Every structure is written in structure tokens, then in C-alpha cells.
């Protein structure tokens, strides 16, 4: 029974975004970064980008045993490792530290940018509310094995517009995070996501906690709120306002779109900061 339980729940808790989402976020970040860097030595080459994106996608999509025993949720408490029945590592922090160490010790170009891709994978996942709150996403008895936010499509045109063509925002990201390490990037990205979850839903007497409800203990798992695991879908739940007994969000509601766009923008921003950090080291600056 224990083995069956671990098999069922472990397979669905390991990662947030799937490979194609990670790849798209990575390519957007590299394109904007390269466009805004004047020094040719600081730009990512096609080969470096390929190593980074490939490792990122493989970490998201592959590895039965990795997915079974590492769930990679964020610990908002003290960021120490947590386990389930001394078998399953439920938090990502120890594994992330190992990846950063591997990156720092990398000798070959292939190892260096592959390890960067694995680090970036975790940074991007910190824009997934269910992985930061965190909320355990498995509902296998309902044939529901993931958080629906993680499947929400990326609006690439909107991201391009928000990042801008004049490089002011990208340059600001690079400058502002010049002394920011990968561990701090992880924490800052997670904190931004958690603050967004606690933010108001425009026009409704609720915060986004109606979807992902944190536990009062920051070291414990939260749960789905009154709206359930229905991000992006039509959903209705009891309102706090007696004149409007039901709050309703529609399929692909503009409120969903704006929330997702902000999270995806933050994923691109933290990716730019991470790859800029490695490129500075490579260039010796």
C-alpha cells in the first residue's frame, strides 16, 4: 500500500510547468537578453542556448525516479528539506543547492549550460502558485493530476510588449540583480508569486487565495480554496457580498489572463537575471 501511494502521488507532484512551457519561457528570455547586450562575448550562442533549454525541458518532463521521490515544492518557512515517510523529498531546496553547486563546479561548456538550464527550471517553477503556496496538486481520485494554472498558455506577444523593445526593462533587470545569487533569485521569485496570490481579484471581494489557500503554518501544505483547481475555467463560488451571493469567473476570463501574464513575465525576468549572472562569470566581469 505504501508503495502504491508513493507511486500515485509522487508522479504528479514533482514539477510545475511542463517542458514546452519551460522551453518557450527560456527562448523568450534569451531573445530579449541577447537583443539588449552590446558585448558579443556576453551574448548566449545558439549552442549555449540549446544546452540550457534541453536540460530545462528534460528536468521538467523526464525522470521517473526523480519525479517519484522529489516533488520540488517551495518551503516558505525556513527553506529546509522536508520528507514524507522519510522517503519522498517534498521540498526543492536541498536539490536546488546541489544544482547550484554543480553549476559553480562545471568545467565544460555542455555541463555549465546544462546545469544552468536545471537551475532555471526551478526558478521558473517559482512562478507557479501551487508550488509556492504550496498546494499539493494531486487529485488522482478525480483523474486530476496537475494544477490548471500550469497549463495556461503563454501570451508571447504580450510578454514582448511588456518587456519592451527599448531594453529599458531588460537592462534594469540585469543591473538590479547584478549582486543577486541564484538562491536569492529563487526566494525573490517565490515571494513575488506568494504576494500575487494574496492580492485582490479585481472587482471581486476575494484574493487569489480563493484558488490556492495557504496554511497558517508557512512550513505546511495549503489547500485549494473555494474556487478549487479551476484556474482558466468557468467557476462559481459563494461571495462575501450579500447583494451578489455568487462570484463567477468565466472560461479564459480577462482576470485569469492578467494574472497569468504577470506570472509568466516574472518567469522570463528571473530567467534573464540567472543567465546574465552566468554570462558575467564567463566574461570575467
Where are these regions (language model features)?
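Bacterial N-terminal signal peptides
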Residues: 1-9
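N-terminal, motif-rich segments that launch catalysis or mediate targeting to/interaction with membranes
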Residues: 10-118, 125, 129-285
Amino acid at each position: 500500500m505504501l508503495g502504491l501511494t508513493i507511486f500515485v502521488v509522487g508522479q504528479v507532484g514533482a514539477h510545475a510547468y511542463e517542458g514546452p512551457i519551460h522551453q518557450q519561457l527560456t527562448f523568450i528570455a534569451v531573445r530579449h537578453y541577447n537583443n539588449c547586450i552590446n558585448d558579443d562575448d556576453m551574448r548566449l550562442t545558439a549552442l549555449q542556448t540549446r544546452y540550457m533549454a534541453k536540460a530545462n525541458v528534460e528536468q521538467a518532463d523526464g525522470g521517473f525516479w526523480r519525479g517519484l521521490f522529489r516533488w520540488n515544492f517551495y518551503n516558505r518557512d525556513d527553506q529546509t528539506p522536508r520528507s514524507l515517510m522519510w522517503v519522498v523529498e517534498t521540498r526543492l531546496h536541498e536539490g536546488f543547492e546541489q544544482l547550484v553547486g554543480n553549476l559553480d563546479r562545471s568545467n565544460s561548456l555542455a555541463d555549465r549550460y546544462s546545469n544552468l538550464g536545471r537551475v532555471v527550471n526551478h526558478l521558473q517553477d517559482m512562478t507557479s502558485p501551487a508550488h509556492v503556496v504550496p498546494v499539493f496538486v494531486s487529485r488522482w481520485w478525480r483523474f486530476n493530476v496537475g494544477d490548471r494554472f500550469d497549463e495556461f498558455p503563454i501570451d508571447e506577444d504580450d510578454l514582448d510588449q511588456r518587456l519592451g523593445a527599448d531594453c529599458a526593462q531588460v537592462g534594469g533587470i540585469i543591473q538590479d540583480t547584478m549582486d543577486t545569487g541564484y538562491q536569492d533569485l529563487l526566494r525573490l521569485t517565490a515571494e513575488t508569486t506568494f504576494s500575487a496570490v494574496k492580492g485582490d481579484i479585481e472587482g471581486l471581494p476575494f484574493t487569489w487565495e480563493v484558488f490556492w489557500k495557504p496554511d497558517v503554518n508557512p512550513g505546511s501544505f495549503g489547500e485549494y480554496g473555494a474556487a478549487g483547481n479551476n484556474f482558466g475555467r468557468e467557476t462559481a463560488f459563494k461571495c462575501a457580498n450579500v447583494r451578489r451571493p455568487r462570484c463567477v469567473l468565466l472560461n479564459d476570463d480577462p482576470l485569469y489572463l492578467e494574472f497569468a501574464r504577470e506570472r509568466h513575465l516574472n518567469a522570463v525576468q528571473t530567467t534573464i537575471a540567472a543567465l546574465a549572472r552566468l554570462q558575467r562569470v564567463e566574461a570575467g566581469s
